C-alpha cells in the first residue's frame, strides 16, 4: 500500500511539474512576502545623547531617476542573460554591451560587405515568411512586418481546456559601415510587441525584456548567415574538386594562354592544386593581381614506380623558376605561363605542356 501511494504521489508531482508554464519557470521560487515590507528607519536617538556611528556596509544604493521600479516579486524574471553569438567567421561582439549588435569583418571579397549582410538578412526573412514593412538600402535600414507566433497554452492539469497565445513583434535592423567599407555593425531593435491570450492583450512592449527579444532575432539571423556560408563553402569545394576543361587561346594581353572553363575565384585554388600535383613549388603569390611565383622541381615518384612505369605527369621544363599569370575572363579564366623574366611562353612551347595540364586539370578527384 505504501509503495502504491509513493508511486501515485510521484506521478502527480511529475504531472504538476510538467504543466508549469514558461513564465512560472522564469520567476523565483518561494513566497514574495518581502514585497509587502516597508523600509526601516534609523534608530531615533534623543537629542541629549551622543549619536553612535552607524555602519553603512549594507546600505542599498539609491536608484537612478530612469531605473525601472516595477520589476519586483513575480514581475522579476530570473533568467540567464541574453548573449549575442558571433558564429560567422570574422564576426565579434563588444563585451558588456547593452545593445543587440554584432560586428562583421570583410572575409569574402566577391561582393561588398553590406550587400552580403543584407542579402543574408533578406534570405532569412523570406525563409521564415516574415514580411518587410520598409527597406532603405541607402540609409541601411530595414523594418520588418509583424512577426507572429502562436502557442497553445494548456490550462490546469485537471482541465481539458486550453488557451491560444499570440505574440506579435516588429523589429528594425540598422547597418553601420566603417569608412573603409570592410567592417559593419548590424543592430537589432524591438519596435513593437503585443501578446494576446484569447481576446485579451496581456503584454505590450513596456512589459517585456526588449533586449532578450532583440538578441534572439539577431542570433537567428547570424545563424542563418553562418549556415549560408557553410553551404557556399561546401558548394565551392565541390566545384574545386570537380575537373575543369582547358583549351589554348589568348589572355587579355594577346599572349598564348590556357583558357579554363571556370570563374576566377574557383579556378584560382584549382590552379594551385594542379601546380602542386605537377611538381611546382609555389614560392609566392598575389591573388589580387593574379600572379604566381613558382619553381619547377619535377614530380616526386618512388624508385619502384620509376622501374615499372614512366612518369605521366612529367613536363618538358628545366628545373628552375617560372611565373604564372591568372586573369579573370568572365565565366572563364586565362592561365599564362611565363619564364623568370615574365616573358610568355610561345604557342608551340605552351602546346608541349597542354596534354599534361589538361589531364590533371580534368581530374575529378584531385586531393585538396
Curated annotation (Swiss-Prot):
The keyword Signal applies. One of its GO terms (cellular component) is cell outer membrane. It is a lipid-anchor. A lipid is attached at residue 19 (N-palmitoyl cysteine). Residues 1-18 form the signal peptide. It is found in: Cell outer membrane. Its main location: membrane. It comes from the Bacteria. GO terms for biological process: Gram-negative-bacterium-type cell outer membrane assembly; protein insertion into membrane. A lipid is attached at residue 19 (S-diacylglycerol cysteine). It holds the Pfam family Lipoprotein_18. Belongs to the BamC family. HAMAP family: OM_assembly_BamC. Part of the Bam complex. Part of the outer membrane protein assembly complex, which is involved in assembly and insertion of beta-barrel proteins into the outer membrane. This is Outer membrane protein assembly factor BamC. It comes from Pseudoalteromonas atlantica (strain T6c / ATCC BAA-1087).
